[in-house]
């Protein structure tokens, strides 16, 4: 909603940084998606399946399907060698297989076009991931765009982390949930418009697993922008979580209307304008020049010859 309102008022976007959900939205815009394109994707049934990990029935092997149960997860033991029983808990709530495949489809063409340099996207872009072993943020501005976004949104226990440059990368919000410092250090913009849709973890609740995990892993973030640096828009959502994509329209409208209410102030700080038709044309040219996605080789790991 914020992006749509700014575009409609000819406010230019020169750089984008984002963490977690901000990395998803920011990366889509950075690789040439319009607000309409992003809304169509996020509203689609396909997207709901990707972030929930559900498999379409036509792709399920019915003879291997388990009997439906209300269980949250289960643990299986193999007593063939009772001295080496090693029970394993699930690594994530959401099965990552569909999301991993879809991120290749979504981001591979833009990665190829920019040759792994996020400064060469339609809009230069950075996102943040977390190295929990070394207790530090990772600023991602090069490499595979899909992997960067996938890492930035990998909140512990919800989504499985991925490995980037031999580092297990988690959600960037653990150490930096509002990367205005990265925006300043990497891009040196004249004005920053910051959108805050999160807050530092509140006191954990006895029956709320997510609030307990947040308090265990997330460091406090400075959600402020000095007036001399930019404009801050803060949204308080007490009952919205990482997977609430069903409330997209509600959240879009809140962001859109709030941005319009601040438009006079924004225009007073940002004097340069861009022509909407010119932006659409540049976006069309950029998207049309993206290479086609072809799979030349497929490597299968962890399977025997019969399984392959």
Which residue stretches match the model-derived regions?
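Patatin-like phospholipase
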Residues: 1-19, 27-308
């Amino acid at each position: 909603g914020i992006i749509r309102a700014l575009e409609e008022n000819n406010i230019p976007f020169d750089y984008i940084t984002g963490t977690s959900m901000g990395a998803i939205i920011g990366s889509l815009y950075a690789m040439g998606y319009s607000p309409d394109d992003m809304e169509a994707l996020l509203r689609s049934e396909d997207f709901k399946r990707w972030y929930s990990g559900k498999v379409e029935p036509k792709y399920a092997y019915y003879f291997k399907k388990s009997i439906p149960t209300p269980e949250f997860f289960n643990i299986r033991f193999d007593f063939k060698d009772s001295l080496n029983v090693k029970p394993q808990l699930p690594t994530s709530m959401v099965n990552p297989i569909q999301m991993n495949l879809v991120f290749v489809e979504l981001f591979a063409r833009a990665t190829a076009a920019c040759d792994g340099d996020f400064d060469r996207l339609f809009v230069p872009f950075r996102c943040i991931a977390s190295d929990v072993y070394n207790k530090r943020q990772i600023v991602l501005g090069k490499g595979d765009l899909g992997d960067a976004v996938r890492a930035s949104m990998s909140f512990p226990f919800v989504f499985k982390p991925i490995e980037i440059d031999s580092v297990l990368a988690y959600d960037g919000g653990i150490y930096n949930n509002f990367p205005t410092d990265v925006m300043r250090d990497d891009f040196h913009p004249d004005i920053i418009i910051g959108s805050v849709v999160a807050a530092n973890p509140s006191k954990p609740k006895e029956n709320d697993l997510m609030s307990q995990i947040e308090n265990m892993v997330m460091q406090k973030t400075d959600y402020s922008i000095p007036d001399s640096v930019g404009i801050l828009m803060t949204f308080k959502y007490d009952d919205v979580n990482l997977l609430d994509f069903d409330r997209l329209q509600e959240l879009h409208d809140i962001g859109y209307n709030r941005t319009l209410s601040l438009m006079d102030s924004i225009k007073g700080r940002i004097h340069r304008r861009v022509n909407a038709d010119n932006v659409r044309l540049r976006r069309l040219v950029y998207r049309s020049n993206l290479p086609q996605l072809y799979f030349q080789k497929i490597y299968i790991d962890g399977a025997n010859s019969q399984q392959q």
